[in-house]
């Protein structure tokens, strides 16, 4: 079967209602796979699906519903749901705007993708989040910048931006 559209998301009321009490198969994806609109997927039950989303489709998200079906007798069948694997990240919580500017500038020179969160976000504090890299962690330690290594499911995949100098 080729999946050509996302039917909803189980984290939304409409998506949860669509799936209902169907058996849930899961496709476990790393963050880097969330940006690929064409790929082959395998569920935790060994079933294979092709994914071919139209150009301009949004990135996949945790909880996206790929298929729902009913069996031949009209009984509720299966739903195939995207589950995002956790990512090894560094959560950087600078003590001041000056310190955050220093860190962002230094890591920006390495062209690392970063995500920024305010105190109302999932980390409960202002934070810059990057994928774990031992050289970044060494840099943060050397400059006494508060940071924490965590395994997190990121809502938005890290994405490398094209650039030239």
From Swiss-Prot:
GO MF annotation terms: nickel cation binding; unfolded protein binding
Keyword field contains Cytoplasm: yes
Cell location: Cytoplasm
SMART domains registered for this protein in UniProt: UreE_N
GO biological process, one term: urea metabolic process
Top-rank taxon: Bacteria
Pfam families associated with the record: UreE_C, UreE_N
Membrane-spanning parts: none
Keyword field contains Translocase: no
Gene Ontology CC terms: cytoplasm
Entry similarity comment: Belongs to the UreE family.
Protein name: Urease accessory protein UreE
Gene source species: Micrococcus luteus (strain ATCC 4698 / DSM 20030 / JCM 1464 / CCM 169 / CCUG 5858 / IAM 1056 / NBRC 3333 / NCIMB 9278 / NCTC 2665 / VKM Ac-2230)
Gene name in the database record: ureE
């Amino acid at each position: 079967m080729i999946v050509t559209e996302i039917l909803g998301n189980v984290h939304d009321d409409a998506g949860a209602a669509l799936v209902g009490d169907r058996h849930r198969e899961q496709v476990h994806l790393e963050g880097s796979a969330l940006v690929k609109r064409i790929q082959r997927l395998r569920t935790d039950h060994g079933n294979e699906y092709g994914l071919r989303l139209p150009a301009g489709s949004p990135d996949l998200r945790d909880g996206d519903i790929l298929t729902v079906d009913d069996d031949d007798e009209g009984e509720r069948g299966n739903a195939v749901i995207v589950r995002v694997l956790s990512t090894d990240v560094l959560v950087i919580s600078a003590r001041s705007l000056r310190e955050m500017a220093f860190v962002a500038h230094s890591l920006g020179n390495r062209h690392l993708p970063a995500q920024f969160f305010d105190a109302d976000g999932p980390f409960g504090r202002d934070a810059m989040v990057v994928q774990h890299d031992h050289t970044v962690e060494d840099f943060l330690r050397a400059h006494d910048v508060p940071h924490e290594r965590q395994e997190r499911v990121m809502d938005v995949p890290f994405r490398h931006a094209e650039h030239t100098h």
